[in-house]
Every structure is written in C-alpha cells, then in structure tokens.
Amino acid sequence: MSDNCFCRQAVTNDAFALSDLLTQLGYPDTADFMVSKLNAIANDAAAVCWVAEINQQVVGFLSLHIIPQLALAGDFARISYFCIDETARSHGVGKALLQQAEAYAREQRCDRMEVHCHQRRVDAHRFYVREGFAESPKYFIKML
C-alpha cells in the first residue's frame, strides 16, 4: 500500500479528514477549530503538518514543531500529532510520513526528534522503537 502513498503539506481543506483521524485517537469534536489550527501551523515558521494520501484520500497526518535549544548546538523536532487511519496501519503510511518529517528536521538542522505517546498506545510504541526511537523515562505536564 505504501507504493500508492503520497505525502504533502496539509491545507485547510484537509480539516474534516484530520478531525476524523483525531477522533480515532480519542480527540472528538475538533472540527470546530481545525481550520484555525491548520492556518496557525501554516503561518508558523517553526511548524509544519503533512498528510498522507492514498487514491486522493487522506489516511494519515503528522504535525511537527522545531524547537531551538540554547545549550546545545543542534535543535530538536517534536512530533505533536501523528495518526494513521485504522484501516491503513501496518502498510508503510506511518513510515512514509516519518521519513518526510525526519528529512525536514535534518534540513532545519535538528539533531534529534521526540514524540510523546500515551502509555496505552502499545502498537505505536512498537512502531517508534522499530523506527529507531528510544524510550525516555520522564515526562511532566502541568495544565494551565
């Protein structure tokens, strides 16, 4: 299936498809603000969002942010959202999006990439390890 996979930058017309994918991840009701979020990413030089299409249908997306580091020579890239349609998983779509993100991060002079993944997403954990990610033991969050 990955031979038919085409990656491109997301546009506002992708809002409905991305909302559907986020619902699969457990984030319902994103349709009302998805267009404004995609516009914000499009206008942020440190952010990008790609979609993966098969037969002109969006089957996945990945959003990435470049984060400058003061104490290190290289910056790092953070995957903020990464979702593949349940019907398209294990067919190379995620790998294609990740390769797109890695190439872009290298162009931006990043020397590492990170992703936060909920502990219940065991299949995603296996994917990340297979793609060369190492588990990082601590992550703290404070709601504002």
Name each model feature, range by range.
Residues I67, D85, H118:
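Residue-level recognition of the GNAT/N-acetyltransferase active site
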Residues K95, Q119-P137, K142:
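Conserved active-site alpha-helix within GNAT-family acetyltransferase domains
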Residues L98, A105-C117:
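Conserved GNAT acetyl-CoA-binding A-motif
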